[in-house]
Amino acid sequence: MDEKFWEKINTFGENGEFDKVVREIKKLPEDKLDIELINILGRSYMNLGDYENALDTYLSFIGKAKEDVKDVDIWLYSECGWLCNEVGDYEQGLKYLLEAEKLGRDDEWLNTEMGQCLGRLERPEEGLERLKKSLKLIEKEAPENIDEKIFINSEIGFLNGVLENSEEALKYFYIAKDLGRNDNWIYMHLWLNLENTKGKEEALKYFEDEVKANDKNSVLWESLGQIYMNIFQDYDKAEKAFKKAFGLSGDGLNLYNRGIALRLLGKYEEAVEVLLQSRKISVQEGDVTDGEDLDLARCYVALKDKKNAEKYLDLAREGLENVPEEHADEFEATLEEIEDLIEKL
């Protein structure tokens, strides 16, 4: 390809005009396509959310490279496997990854991808075998890749949890945490497996000791707040934990959770104040507000403020389209419940 062609392709890519990248490459005769162009075309389809054409692009080039056919095909099968896994087609993804393995690929990336895939296919023992192999391989291939080590240890912990091997799960979750993982996912999985092995009170003690030692960790405070609120129904401690988490992070989700805790404590006026602040942050960040609207409607019902209760119920109803499908029925039932309560005011 001439320099002008590549300038055009690069400009379109930098501007996010991936439809134009596709159009330019599709104009080319088939014999002009090489692995570089196939890669760009496939990635452009992915950026457009067109995973089917991305997959077809990669599959169509298998066996057609003019040189290094085996290496190119390994890359193509690997890419197809990764792509299928990204869209949740783990069965097909595994087939493509196995094809890459048959051609000779046997590195950390492939084993990690296959381990994750097998886990999602409810084949945890096989997944663990692959992931443990990955841990050994990464020490040889990229010992400095901490993020990948965190991921592998987290997946091994998760699959052990699936198998109800909580002691073994904890071992790997602790490693992931010590390597730097600090999110709700790791803390909730630590909670579940600590609860299974030591009981709720001991599990709670672990988290309370952790926040004492890491008082500035907003994520840890948020996780503790969730434990207080959802496991122990201790809304007073939950409210204080979420307040601390928000003070450290400024994350509106912590403010929202604090508002829920205040509502559950019956402190409706304070809850309204906090939920309105949370809603303002959500609007500023372009986020949905259906959760705040629903809880505001509940608070205004409790305060016998029919006008505002109706206002936020209507806003919550408008947000129904943003609710994940698996929660839509529950959300609609809650809307109807609040509507009935408003009618009685």
Across the structure, where does each feature detected by a protein language model lie?
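Structural motif corresponding to the intra-repeat A-B loop/turn of tetratricopeptide repeats
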Residues: 15, 48, 87, 121, ...
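TPR-repeat structural position
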Residues: 18, 51, 90, 124, ...
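Short coil turns that delineate tetratricopeptide repeat
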Residues: 32-33, 66, 105, 139, ...
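Canonical positions in the second alpha-helix
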Residues: 27-28, 61, 99-100, 133-134, ...
